[in-house]
A protein has these predicted regions:
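Membrane-interfacial helix-loop-helix
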Residues: 19-79, 84-90, 118-119, 140-154
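N-terminal Rossmann-like FAD-binding beta1-loop-alpha1 element of flavoenzymes
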Residues: 166-193, 342-351
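Glycine-rich dinucleotide-binding loop and its adjacent helix/turn
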Residues: 208, 300-359, 384-388, 438-440, ...
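A Rossmann-like FAD-binding core segment of flavoenzymes
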Residues: 234-235, 270-273, 277-285, 291, ...
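A conserved FAD-binding loop/helix module that cradles the flavin
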Residues: 369-376, 466-526, 603-625
Length: 639
């Protein structure tokens, strides 16, 4: 109709008529919705509508203008929806007319040019071609304009400094903050890195590095117990726990120079120790001094979550942050949580001599993995004497002269466990307190992480967030991955912005057996109705695994039906975290199983399992008709 109006009445008359007619029609639909539906919806869903109404009363006009300017949703749905929300009809009318006016002008212009056609040759005239080009680019122009307006709106309440001390301020010196700072310094930007604790963050000081050092000591102790399997005399294993923990600290101290103030200062980063608070989109206060920067990156990480359970606060509980301070192994260790952290540390302490009880409210350990994967790890735990309780919720902790106990309940059952120390491994919470985010209007997600867009921007367009504080994946390698996008978008986003690539995200749980995965699991594929075919290779048949007495586990790959394109892969077994990387590379660069099969793998290595899996995939799809003719040919050739 808009095109027809332009063709019949010319540009200005049509623009006037169509603009008013569409706005009046939209307002009439709005009023019908308000009269017939608003009271019923507000009464029925009042509990849920409170926050929506409050937000719309504050920013409703801008939301409506955005929906009108960038016509993503059908206008008739917008008319009905807006009638349910707290906006006055007059405001609805003029905001709608203003928001629809640019698109109306573009379409009326196209109709005007079409109406002036005198012959087919006029189709390639400059005015008509220009109108078609304008129609094509308008959605992109509208989105750019909307983004520009949102940015100006977010910054309008603050006074922008005339000059900046820094190009970039990074808050947090964990994996994300270190990488973001390094990138900025590498491209010769002036960057200040603020850290309130130790350089290197959780990964170096309380996470990845110390836990893997502890796991290694525990594995060696387990190997000593298995001496007879390797033809050695049986060994009596005596674990000197204080020396084990001293070794863990030596490992941390050896790695620490990689993340030190001295190294990063030498690379061009200004390192500051202290608590950071963001005062404005360009100002950060630290140690009583206000620093300015054109852009800010929040990389403040996360901390162990402490559940609110009666009696817990009165105990000297352990977390993944504090467990490295102990020098006496608990005789009875209770571990709450059976995710990666809980499973890794539970098994390590069991191998170092503690009697471990692992308790989780989930129906199985490692709930993010397929059941058969979790079962392999569970079987190993049970063989090593661990107690595992799934589906139980802790309801109360008690402590008296007889010791410490925890009461757990499940459907129709109640248990009480005695313990000496309890380790909390029930997840992690983003460090967002005392940064000044609420005052700036920077929101959080339901998971409690900083809300960011696909470019890692917060609600303030020059403040970015990356790593554990932003989620959605709390992995060190993901923090480093996000940091590149945050730093580059902050420094060069005015020229080109990059969306974070989450298409191929690998991770590993360093239990024994190890579990490593990338892409879809079989459970996720089923839940999301993704068509797939599954291929499996059991590692107990692999020569190198047999030679190493580590012949257990499997490799499983999901592929598109009828194709060798990999949708996901999981490896369970010895050095699974190393083996998965071939599939990570393949998925990232579109390499299928046929090319993995055609690649020479060194013999004897564990990585041959990946090639053998590709062989199993190929074998299941062998061309039976061609092989039948080949058999006849060979029979004929024998005479």
């Amino acid at each position: 109709m808009t095109l027809a109006g332009g063709a019949l009445f010319g540009f200005w008359y049509a623009l006037l008529l169509v603009s008013f007619a569409s706005s009046i029609g939209a307002t009439l639909a709005f009023l019908v919705s308000r009269v017939l539906l608003r009271d019923w919806v507000q009464e029925r869903f009042g509990r849920h509508m409170g926050a929506v109404n409050a937000g719309f009363e504050r920013d409703g006009s801008f939301y409506l203008f955005s929906l009108r300017l960038v016509p993503i949703f059908p206008f008739f749905l917008i008319n009905l929806l807006m009638g349910l929300l707290p906006i006055r009809p007059w405001r609805y009318y003029w905001v709608s007319q203003l928001g629809m006016l640019p698109a109306t002008a573009v379409y009326v212009n196209a109709g005007t040019q079409l109406g002036q056609l005198q012959s087919l040759s006029g189709i390639i005239s400059a005015p008509l071609l220009g109108s078609f080009v304008l129609l094509a680019v308008f959605p992109f122009m509208a989105r750019w304009l909307l983004g520009y307006m949102q940015g100006r709106r977010a910054l309008a309440a603050y006074d922008r400094p005339q000059r900046f001390d820094n190009n970039l301020i990074v808050i947090g010196a964990g994996s994300a903050g270190l990488v973001a700072s390094l990138i900025a310094a590498t491209v010769k930007a002036k960057v200040t890195l603020i850290e309130r604790g130790k350089m290197g963050g959780d990964c170096l000081n309380t996470g990845c590095v110390p836990s893997k050092a502890l796991i290694r000591s525990a594995r060696v102790a387990q190997y000593a117990r298995r001496a007879g399997e390797f033809g050695l005399a049986p060994m009596s294993v005596e674990v000197n726990f204080p020396r084990v923990m001293e070794r863990v600290q030596r490992v941390v101290e050896t790695v620490a120079p990689h993340d030190s103030v001295e190294r990063f200062t030498g690379l061009g980063v200004n390192c500051v120790q202290g608590d950071a608070r963001i005062l404005s989109p360009w100002e950060v206060e630290v140690n009583g001094e206000v620093l300015t920067a054109r852009n800010i990156v929040i990389a403040s990480g996360a901390r162990p979550r402490v559940p609110d359970i009666p009696g817990l606060a009165q105990l000297d509980y352990l977390t993944s942050d504090t467990i490295w301070d102990i020098r006496e192994a608990p005789q009875r260790l209770l571990v709450l949580g059976a995710g990666p952290i809980g499973c890794e540390l539970a098994q390590a302490f069991a191998r170092l001599g503690s009697h471990v009880s692992l308790v989780t409210h989930a129906s199985r350990i490692m709930p993010r993995e397929d059941p058969e994967v979790a079962q392999q790890v569970l079987d190993a735990f049970l063989r090593q004497g661990m107690d595992v309780h799934t589906g139980y919720d802790p309801v109360r902790f008690t402590a008296d002269e007889e010791g410490q106990r925890c009461v757990f309940t499940t459907a129709g059952d109640r248990r009480e466990l005695a313990f000496d120390r309890v380790l909390l491994a029930v997840g992690r919470s983003a460090n967002v307190q005392e940064l000044g985010l609420e005052a700036l209007g920077i929101g959080l997600t339901r998971a409690g992480t900083v809300a960011v867009d696909e470019y890692l921007r917060t609600a303030i367009p020059n403040i970015f967030a990356c790593g554990d504080v932003a989620g959605p994946y709390m992995f060190t390698h993901m923090a480093s991955h996000q940091a590149w996008y945050a730093a580059v978008n902050a420094l060069f986003g005015r020229f080109r912005k990059f969306k974070v690539d989450y298409s191929v995200v690998p991770w590993a749980t360093f239990t024994d057996p190890e579990v490593a995965r990338v892409g879809l699991s079989e459970s996720e594929a089923r839940d999301n109705n993704v068509a797939y075919e599954v291929t499996r290779y059991d590692i107990d048949d692999l020569d190198r695994a047999i030679a190493d007495s580590e012949a257990h586990g499997f490799v499983k790959v999901l592929t598109e039906p009828g194709r060798d394109r990999i949708l996901g892969a999981v490896v369970v077994g010895y050095h699974a975290a190393e083996l998965i990387n071939e599939f990570v590379l393949a998925m990232k660069h579109g390499i299928g199983l046929n090319k993995i099969l055609a690649t020479i793998h060194i013999y004897p290595t564990l990585s041959e399992s990946n090639k053998f899996l590709a062989g199993e995939w190929r074998k299941a799809r062998k061309p039976e008709r061609v092989l039948s003719w080949a058999e006849r040919y060979h029979r004929w050739n024998r005479g």
